[in-house]
């Protein structure tokens, strides 16, 4: 059963501006420790940041909280399965919160075209 749906759209220009203004502190604010390790090797670092920012915002909308409490940028990670499909992974506090809410899965789709990045998340009970 669908619990909630979230989407977010981000301009790469916005992420470029934030990255220039705040540098590594910006990445440190929105990426998990695992993502921070991958970030320097990303072929397109700005796209990497933008996709993760959009995906985490979409996640927060799908679960209905916005970014607050256990639903924080550093508790929401994005990885890929064996076939390359994007998927969320969670910090311990968020895993516990999701279980308390009865949310069993949050699916993710991301896309980018030109200056725009889009993420779509579906939370299920």
Swiss-Prot record:
What does it do? Transfers the 4'-phosphopantetheine moiety from coenzyme A to a Ser of acyl-carrier-protein.
Query: SUPFAM superfamilies, alphabetically?
Result: 4'-phosphopantetheinyl transferase
Residues at which Mg(2+) binds:
8, 57
Question: Which cofactors are required for activity?
Answer: Mg(2+)
Query: What chemistry does it catalyse, as a reaction equation?
Result: apo-[ACP] + CoA = holo-[ACP] + adenosine 3',5'-bisphosphate + H(+)
Supply one GO molecular-function term. holo-[acyl-carrier-protein] synthase activity
Which of UniProt's keywords are assigned here?
Answer: Cytoplasm, Fatty acid biosynthesis, Fatty acid metabolism, Lipid biosynthesis, Lipid metabolism, Magnesium, Metal-binding, Transferase
Compartment(s) of residence: Cytoplasm
What is the protein name for this chain?
Holo-[acyl-carrier-protein] synthase
Annotated Gene Ontology cellular components are:
cytoplasm
Q: What is its EC number?
A: 2.7.8.7
